[in-house]
């Protein structure tokens, strides 16, 4: 967990039976200034943190037994201005960081042995104003960035070397102060939380080009000031953290159209100012990441 105000990262072990969290020995671990976004590679070997106050990315190796974090050689690695969210592709080969202050996206290749980051050719790549949330589709073919200040979503084709190329028609509209962005497990739909209009925009993804087309009926109502968006590993449900109303909206996803319908009992209570949100698949009582 990235602790924005204390410039460090908290790490926990998870009880397989109760789900309770216990701090890892040595936690919290030092990071840069104002750490915000955090991501772990698909194999659970490395962790990366975007430090929005020091314009860099901290990288750590994860001890498989204890969960202890150890900075990798060369960490922290330079980023753009005010890096916010970051994501790692499903192959674990590349990482992408949305730089809010410099209106671009930093792309890195990940050394499979050391975890070190190296900028891919041409990085950083231009985005809209105030890029915030970033997502990679499960096939690692496309990257999507929510541009909060320009009210649109940038879409990129990912080349084999990690280089990003804007897809035809990018950026795509239909959003208002977009923050969080998520893609479903089969790369068919994308969802964006609109902080400025209290709703969620839904798009179909062209499997060949990566272009976005608004789903019929989009945007769909949410709570007040929606931020984080997540789709469960089955692709049947979507969830939105509403910062202003202190709750979580849950939706069923129409598998054919991508349309969102609130689930029974939605919204569900949360703490004050919920922001990030994530889901996992439960296997024999344990939370597991989606299969690669």
How would you describe each model-predicted region?
Residues 1-292:
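Predominantly soluble domains enriched in secretory-pathway, periplasmic, or organellar proteins
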């Amino acid at each position: 967990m990235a602790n924005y105000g204390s410039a460090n990262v908290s790490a926990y072990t998870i009880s397989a039976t109760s789900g309770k969290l216990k701090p890892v020995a040595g936690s919290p671990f030092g990071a840069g200034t104002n750490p915000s976004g955090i991501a772990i590679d698909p194999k659970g070997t490395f962790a990366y943190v975007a430090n929005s106050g020091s314009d860099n990315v901290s990288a750590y190796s994860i001890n498989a037994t204890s969960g202890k974090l150890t900075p990798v050689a060369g960490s922290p690695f330079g980023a753009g201005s005010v890096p916010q969210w970051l994501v790692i592709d499903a192959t674990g080969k590349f990482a992408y960081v949305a730089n809010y202050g410099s209106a671009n996206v930093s792309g890195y290749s990940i050394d499979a042995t050391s975890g070190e980051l190296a900028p891919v050719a041409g990085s950083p790549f231009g985005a809209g104003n105030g890029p915030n949330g970033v997502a990679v589709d499960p096939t690692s073919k496309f990257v999507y960035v929510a541009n909060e200040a320009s009210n649109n979503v940038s879409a990129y084709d990912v080349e084999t070397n990690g280089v990003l190329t804007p897809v035809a028609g990018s950026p795509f509209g239909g959003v208002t102060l977009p923050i969080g962005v998520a893609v479903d497990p089969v790369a068919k739909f994308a969802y964006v939380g609109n902080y400025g209009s209290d709703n969620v925009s839904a798009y179909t993804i062209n499997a060949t080009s990566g272009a976005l087309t608004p789903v019929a009926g989009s945007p769909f109502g949410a709570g007040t000031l929606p931020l984080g968006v997540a789709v469960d590993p089955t692709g049947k449900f979507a969830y939105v953290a509403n910062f202003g109303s202190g709750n979580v909206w849950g939706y069923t996803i129409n598998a054919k159209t991508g349309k969102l319908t609130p689930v029974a009992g939605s919204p569900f209570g949360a703490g004050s100012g919920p922001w990030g949100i994530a889901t996992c698949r439960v296997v024999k009582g344990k939370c597991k990441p989606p299969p690669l």
